[in-house]
Regions:
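Short, positively charged and aromatic/hydrophobic N-terminal segments
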Residues: 9-18
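Structured adenosyl-cofactor binding patch, chiefly the S-adenosyl-L-methionine
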Residues: 91, 129, 144, 151-156, ...
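Glycine/small-residue-rich loop that forms an oxyanion/phosphate-binding "nest" at active or ligand-binding sites
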Residues: 75-93
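RNA substrate-binding interface of SAM-dependent RNA methyltransferases
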Residues: 18, 103-188
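Intrinsic-disorder-associated, low-complexity terminal segments enriched in Asp/Asn/His/Tyr and depleted
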Residues: 2-3, 15
Length: 256
């Protein structure tokens, strides 16, 4: 069977230890319950689906349960899945211990109230592409272990660390160290200008909430407000960009 071959090939150390017998009704019910944040937090685990995503996450997280056609029927996998079209494999992983440590000598991202799981997942995946390894998140940012977030990252969660912190306080501390804090604002400086970004290798890039942008508590700490210009400048365009797309545009400029 394809699934057996995949997991024996790519995760051989855990395949036989985890797939021993058919999943019980209690296990199936438990996996389904993990769609709720309170249950994920209580158990200290999260769920991923699809062979590629699971294989990527096995490199960074402890796999505690694996459901495949070898130990669960298609109906049971559908019951456990949070996807409209289940991908046939489901993994439950141990959440790592909370870590508030973050680097201060490289470029990092800060998210202020990003609430849509799809946006957060896309941002994590984009950070992985552009070599951003740490993201500071306000406490009201979406849970990075939400199944929709995990799926949208396509395994990037294995390489990008998220730190849920008191964002205004942490940014104040970083600012006091002389670190530049960049934020996307409508009244910002055109980010393609020659002096808009003095240091592309070091600093914090702040992205705001989908509907309200960067909060006033966070905005006061920005040292370099940036504008993503629309083209042509005097044309009527959309009011704003999707935050995932905006993040990709900004990171691309910093890495250019």
């Amino acid at each position: 069977m394809y699934h057996s071959f995949f997991f024996r090939t790519f995760v051989p150390s855990i395949y036989f230890a985890i797939i021993r017998m058919h999943l019980s009704k209690a296990q199936i019910k438990w996996v389904r319950s993990l769609q709720l944040k309170k249950n994920r937090e209580a158990e200290g685990v999260f769920v991923a689906e699809g062979e590629k995503c699971i294989n990527e996450l096995c490199n960074a997280f402890e796999l505690v349960l694996l459901a495949t056609p070898d130990n669960a029927t298609s109906t049971e996998i559908e019951q456990m899945s949070s996807l409209r079209t289940p991908q046939g494999t489901i993994g439950v992983f141990r959440q790592p211990a909370s870590d508030t440590r973050y680097p201060t000598d490289e470029l990092i991202l800060a998210l202020d109230g990003i609430q849509d799981p799809g946006n957060l997942g896309t941002i994590i995946r984009t950070c992985d592409w552009f070599g951003i390894h740490d993201i500071l998140c306000s406490h009201d940012t979406a849970d990075c272990y939400n199944p929709k977030v995990v799926q949208a990252t396509m395994g990037a969660l294995a390489r990008v660390r998220l730190h849920y912190v008191d964002l205004p306080q942490v940014l104040a501390e970083i600012k006091a160290q002389g670190t530049p804090l960049y934020g996307t604002l409508l009244e910002g400086t055109n980010m393609y200008g020659s002096n808009a970004i003095p240091d592309k290798q070091h600093g914090v890039i702040i992205m705001g909430n989908e509907g309200n942008g960067i909060s006033s508590a966070v905005r006061q700490h920005i040292t370099h407000p940036l504008l993503i210009p629309s083209y042509p400048a005097d044309a009527v365009t959309s009011e704003s960009l999707n935050v995932g797309i905006a993040t990709a545009i900004v990171l691309a400029e910093f890495r250019r």
